[in-house]
Amino acid sequence: YLGKPIAPARMKEPLHNNDFRRWVQAMHYANLLHYDHDYAAEGRWGRLVAPQSFAVAVDDGHGAGPACVGCIPDSHLIFGGDEWWFYGPRIYGGDELVNEKVPFDYVVKETSFAGPTCFQSGDNNYYNQNGDFIARQRSTSIRYARENAVEMGAMEATEDPVWTEQELKDLEDKKYEFIKMMHELGHGKRYWDDIEVGDELPVRVIGPHSVASFATEWRAYLFTIWGGTHRPGLDMAAMGFTEEFAGHENDPVMERDNPEWTDGAYFGPSRGHLFPEWARKIGMPRGYGYGASMGAWVLDYLAGWAGEWGMVVHSKASYRGP
């Protein structure tokens, strides 16, 4: 498998500005460049532009495909991290992207979470219709024996925390501080000579997280839309997912027969994110967040601080807590 390309990801229609708007709304990234037509027209690119984090939204599995190859019997998968390289070209409405997917490597380690655990990584190479290389995402998945995770109980089942009205108000005030920072920078430039190692960066607060917020994130990934993707077809059972989790997620044949089974929200390996009882069947304490969204938060945080005249060139993040 390693180093050999697998079926690429391709959307069926060109991207639309509303795809970008839906994405930043789901990721709580209130940058006017990506949703306000008039503001964007006055900026560097003269039109609405996708955030750098958007590339993962055009994949058919938020980057996990090349990091989940080969069979590990009776296993499950969670995201472990993403490393990104960006090469300059931006994504606009009307673009058509393709993701070239190549498995990269793997290592098996002993973990307190699930005993022997496979950390597998794969590259997602995003190109536009002109062949411009936009970005590379090296995604790492954590593949483990489901029964081990449940038996070892590293993450005990818990209920959602309860927030007071004052706590929620304080969070909203803190969230607005980052938004206000972006407004104040506007179309301005953050010059290299004006920053130093050790400068204190602004705080960005995201949350509180809930099943509602996770569902909003999930629906911003274009591959979750019925019929929107050229699906290569994956045999989840052949990769080792347990029978109750394998399902028909991203199954192109089932999508034409009964798409309710295929979009990943209600059935299949991804449903543990939204349904606590299924989360606990794979060793999670309750409904939990999407790794690819965590990666987007990192990229959006850095890009929002840098402003439209800056860009993220390289980022490497590990997802330590779902």
Give residue spans per PLM region.
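A structural microfeature
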Residues: 135-137, 202
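A generic structural micro-feature
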Residues: 76, 114-118
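A short beta-strand signature
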Residues: 118-129
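Active-site beta-strand->loop segment that positions catalytic residues and contacts the acyl thioester
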Residues: 80-96, 105-114, 142-144, 314-322
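A generic structural signal for residues embedded in beta-strands
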Residues: 99-101, 203
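Short, charged beta-turn/beta-strand-edge "cap" motif at the junction between a beta-strand
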Residues: 102-110, 207-210
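Residue-level signal for glycine
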Residues: 131-133
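Hot-dog-fold acyl-thioester-processing enzymes
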Residues: 1-81, 148-309
